Design a protein with these regions (language model features):
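Walker A/P-loop
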Residues: 45-65
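A short beta-strand element within the Helicase C-terminal
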Residues: 128-133, 175-178, 359-372, 395-399
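A conserved SF2-helicase RecA2
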Residues: 374-462
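Conserved Walker A/P-loop ATP-binding site and its immediately adjacent core
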Residues: 59-64, 73-95, 170-175, 307-308
Length: 463
């Protein structure tokens, strides 16, 4: 009979190391020293995550990772990016001297670096790639979604994997679980069972076990680098000091007799009620946004909205504005976003779900949120399109809401504080990562060491 200890030992799985060393002189000359160190660490690991504040140069790091893997293995590497970001990644590749191509199907794949978007993944064979890079990988946060399952299954045998995104959402441990499962380090279920306690019946309510918090963040630091600025790793912060962020809330009143109006006096509580309140104040909010922009008509503005009706009315109210909708053809979206990035479009009206991830708009320093969803991450990402390293001017963020929506600004600031605390915890342990020489990645399985002998009932013992 197999001993129980041997049985448990047999359940442990340590995948083979797939990382390799790269000398700094062999890396792209346009990279900063700290970018080289992080990328070398990721290549040694083979499978890693880069959670970096916007503007730290994740693009050149992921391009270097992909290029080094492709050269070493002699096989193509795939970079997967949001629909509106792929063309920008290609331009960055060309600027830094990488050979890369945009691909829509497997037939388009060329040796070296290939770039596609998440919507095209079903047209590719994951087994043909030596490595995969997920850009803006927070798309995995939809942990019950088809996309998450497709990505994890498609690349489960891919030797080299890199996940790149901004720092995770506040207390969104499910997102970390998805990241670690994509990397093949530990399943999300194992992570939750090891480090977390489930609160109540809501499947999303997980909290860290008190005694496991330090161990959890130490474990995260074995596969993820978390960076708010180069100074987190002891490098100079020259050029990486952000200008002021000015956030102003504008509260409009609705005098329509609606239950969410000035005379109705109710505060929306549920998601449905908040959406109803936004519809009730639609015209007032859009007109307020137009008035704000009219005060500085010669500067560029981004108008973020949540509803199609908001997008349509904003375009009507604001001169020289252009709307980018989800139903637009990919080429039309790309054209409008590039024109805005190059300064040829004065006012862009769109949703965070369309253009809130990955775009670099440091040339613009004014934005308005005319409609907000309940996603903190979407707002965080949308603000970071302009408020990122490389921005030279103070960034002005205007939030236009109705009185029925409550104190939106205070809620945003509360979540921002939560995010800052989470980043600080992760950075605290990540600081030492680059001083270690760790190769590959081990699948973490916590050994079970029973202190009390198991009593087996007589009726389950075979004669």
């Amino acid at each position: 009979m197999v001993k129980y200890e041997d049985f448990l030992a047999g359940k442990q799985h340590i995948p083979p190391s797939c990382g390799f060393e790269v000398d700094k002189p062999a890396m792209n000359i346009h990279m900063f020293e700290w970018q080289k160190d992080i990328t070398r660490w990721a290549l040694r690991k083979g499978r890693a995550a880069l959670f970096e504040e916007c503007g730290n140069g994740k693009t050149i790091q992921q391009l270097e990772f992909a290029d080094q893997v492709a050269k070493r293995e002699g096989r193509p590497v795939l970079i997967v990016a949001p629909l509106t970001v792929g063309a920008q990644t290609l331009r960055e590749a060309q600027k830094f001297g990488y050979s890369a191509a945009i691909c829509r199907t497997q037939a388009d794949v060329t040796p070296g670096i290939n770039i596609t978007n998440y919507e095209m993944l079903q047209h590719f064979d994951g087994r043909s790639f030596a490595g995969v890079v997920l850009d803006e990988s927070s798309i995995l946060k939809n942990y019950t979604g088809k996309m998450r399952n497709q990505i994890i299954e498609m690349f489960k045998d891919t030797p080299y994997r890199l996940s790149c995104t901004a720092t995770p959402s506040p207390n969104d441990y499910m997102e970390l679980g998805n990241q670690v499962e994509f990397l093949g380090i530990m399943s999300r279920t194992e992570m939750l069972a090891t480090y977390f306690i489930h609160d109540g019946s809501d499947t999303s309510k997980w909290r860290l076990k008190g005694h496991a918090e330090d161990r959890f963040w130490e474990w995260v630091s074995t596969w993820a680098v978390v960076l708010t600025c180069p100074g987190d790793l002891g490098y100079p912060n020259d050029g990486y000091i952000l200008p002021p962020l000015n956030m102003t809330e504008h509260i409009v009143e609705v005098e329509s007799g609606d239950k969410y109006s000035l005379f109705g006096g109710e505060i929306a509580k549920t998601l449905t009620e908040r959406r109803d309140a936004r519809r009730a104040s639609l015209r007032e909010r859009c007109e307020q946004a137009a008035e704000i922009i009219a005060q500085n008509p010669d500067e560029q503005w981004v108008c973020w909205c949540d509803l199609n009706a908001e997008s349509e009315l904003l375009t009507e109210c604001i001169p020289n504005s252009e709307e980018v909708r989800g139903s637009d053809k990919p080429e039309a979206k790309e054209d409008a976003l590039i024109r805005f990035a190059n300064g040829y479009l004065s006012v862009l009206v769109t949703k965070p779900s369309i253009a809130g991830f990955g775009m670099n708009w440091q040339q613009c320093h004014n934005m308005i949120f005319v409609g907000l969803s309940d996603s903190y991450e979407q707002m965080y990402q949308a603000i970071r399109r302009c408020y990122r390293f490389g921005q030279k001017r103070p960034v002005n963020v205007h939030i236009v809401t109705s009185a029925a929506e409550g104190d939106v600004k205070a809620n945003v600031e509360r979540k921002e504080q939560q995010a800052a605390e989470m980043k600080q915890n992760m950075v605290q342990y990540t600081k030492e990562i680059l001083r270690k020489d760790i190769r590959g990645q081990e699948r973490i399985v916590i050994p079970y060491d029973p202190q009390i002998a198991m009593i087996v009932p007589d009726w389950v013992i075979s004669e």
